[in-house]
Every structure is written in C-alpha cells, then in structure tokens.
C-alpha cells in the first residue's frame, strides 16, 4: 500500500457496510496512519448489494467519504452497485458500465 499508485476498495455490502474482511484491512492502517496519510493516496470504491432501495448505500457511502477525509485519500470515484445480488442481476444493471467508465477515467 505504501508503494502503490492507487488503491481500489471492493466489497459486497453486508448489513449496510463493508465486509469484515475489508474492515480488517482498513483497521490495520492504524499502525501507519501518519505515513499513509502523508501519501495522499488515490482511491476508488466499488460496492455490490442485492437491495436496490434508494437508501441502501447511505451508510457505506458515508463510511468511505469519512475514511477518505480522515486518511487524506484522493477519491477518484465510486460505484454503488445496488440490485447486484447475482451475476445475472449485475449484467442487467447499469453498474457494469459505471465501473468501466470509472476505470477509463483513471489517470
């Protein structure tokens, strides 16, 4: 993480937040917060959820934005994939195109 150009955090949505696996990785940042914050690392965020309610991603979106603010990450974009509970659902959604466009926009 200290030598990469960018980090992309990808997770399924579990009870309106990131998975425990991703949370564990983020919690490990604590031991080198100062060094990581000084890097102003570029980041992106991709989340997939079965639900497609308009409020489904509110908590996880706030979590990611707060993490970026606290860690001085440079947010390059996010894909909040609601209605993506299976591969077929995801293919029918607009979120595949959103992820593609996010990737194309990165410099």
Positions of predicted regions on the chain:
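Glycine-rich phosphate/pyrophosphate-binding loop and the adjoining helix
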Residues: 65-107
